[in-house]
Amino acid sequence: MNLTLKESLVTRSRVFSPWTAFYFLQSLLINLGLGYPFSLLYTAAFTAILLLLWRTLPRVQKVLVGVSSLVAACYFPFAQAYGAPNFNTLLALHSTNMEESTEILTIFPWYSYLVGLFIFALGVIAIRRKKENEKARWNTFDSLCLVFSVATFFVAPVQNLAWGGVFKLKDTGYPVFRFAKDVIVNNNEVIEEQERMAKLSGMKDTWTVTAVKPKYQTYVVVIGESARRDALGAFGGHWDNTPFASSVNGLIFADYIAASGSTQKSLGLTLNRVVDGKPQFQDNFVTLANRAGFQTWWFSNQGQIGEYDTAIASIAKRADEVYFLKEGNFEADKNTKDEALLDMTAQVLAQEHSQPQLIVLHLMGSHPQACDRTQGKYETFVQSKETSCYLYTMTQTDDLLRKLYDQLRNSGSSFSLVYFSDHGLAFKERGKDVQYLAHDDKYQQNFQVPFMVISSDDKAHRVIKARRSANDFLGFFSQWTGIKAKEINIKYPFISEKKAGPIYITNFQLQKVDYNHLGTDIFDPKP
């Protein structure tokens, strides 16, 4: 048979081989399983790599396929909720223990695990493929695969260079290589941030207090968790689930924007002094109150991993008195209720104090899974049980605020209380009976959170519509408590209708993004 014709037939048989289709499907699922958007280019290029390796280095191909399939299978449920690895996901990995990890695993829909098993099964099939007895000659198809896969490797680096960036081979868009790079780079950034945090947390604060004129005897900061503003009736939600906040005399901020989309990053930027985008962990609102002569208390229902290893722990340990409902690791006992914190505040308020008091309560609030917070209870069904429980967590927090307010009124001391949430959440599996909410950074609702101030001398229920940013929280804290410090630049009166200027948030890639450029994730009230 003519050699050219024979080579043409071999090429055609390989192009239309079931294994070519198999590797294409596997490449596609690995791409999606690692959290990256579908790309026909990289799916086809990775298929070409697998075909080439099978021809030349079959054992290497099996290792690559096996490892990639295993990682993609395990990561697939997370990828659908959180996307590709970034600073936030690696930070969460560092600051989450087995208990919370187990809880997170139960929130993903069952079919995410089914797809993960399917990806793993494809990997097993690929590994078990028998080697061909006769090694075929190198042909045109092999050359095309080689040229195509190598050329694709340079696409992203060349694009970066063309768009004013730097040409780096490590920026290749191949999902497998990109995943490894994203994990390594972001993990190094997290470790560097934690080392810097530990160093600064052990240092003395650098506040220069210039005046201390508190209006009230007791100040209370209640830090909520994962509450998006449109889930609370008092802040424009469709449900009458916050009767206390909706009616109490005080200030409702209708447009308060969180600093970031996760607890550690958001509160790190909110509660600490920030210089060039980096939190100065030694200079936070607790050390400022200490420096001003306040007595400080920190009561938490979020547990404590260690003394310095999270932004919250580094702040909490600076208070004069610190108590955690959960002994030991974060969420060591997920059944502890936020309401138990009121036993601690009752003890503090029952005592007489000569100094001004700052009491901080850190809630579990609406942290996923919401049904674990409510023991499966909800009042109004909306789309899914988890969504319905999420709405009910707002009622639980509202009831806690009511009881805390009553404690403060009965104490006989003048007081002011501020409540806000660290960040919001976004809907996943929208419109399905498994709909749930998880961390995200793409939508305005991830940053739209409640913020309210209730004081003992308030005479009316008022709403402030001017937009406010959590990046200016220390400015608010200074004005609220009457503590002036040289390091705090007051840009505008926080409790006013004066405009605050453009507002930026910090996304999970640690980039500053204009809040107005974010998408929307509407809370559909349909049952």
From Swiss-Prot:
Residues 55-62, 128-146 are cytoplasmic. It is an enzyme of class 2 (transferase). InterPro entries: Alkaline_phosphatase_core_sf, PEA_transferase, Sulfatase_N. One of its GO terms (cellular component) is plasma membrane. Keywords: Cell inner membrane, Cell membrane, Membrane, Transferase, Transmembrane, Transmembrane helix. Catalyzes the addition of a phosphoethanolamine moiety to the osmoregulated periplasmic glucan (OPG) backbone. The keyword Cell membrane applies. Its EC number is 2.7.-.-. This is Phosphoethanolamine transferase OpgE. Pathway: Glycan metabolism; osmoregulated periplasmic glucan (OPG) biosynthesis. Residues 1-33, 84-106, 168-527 are periplasmic. PANTHER family: INNER MEMBRANE PROTEIN, PHOSPHOETHANOLAMINE TRANSFERASE OPGE-RELATED. One of its GO terms (molecular function) is phosphotransferase activity, phosphate group as acceptor. The keyword Cell membrane applies. GO terms for biological process: lipopolysaccharide core region biosynthetic process; osmoregulated periplasmic glucan biosynthetic process. It is a multi-pass membrane protein. Belongs to the phosphoethanolamine transferase family. It is found in: Cell inner membrane. It holds the Pfam family Sulfatase. The lineage of its organism: Bacteria, Pseudomonadati, Pseudomonadota, Gammaproteobacteria, Enterobacterales.
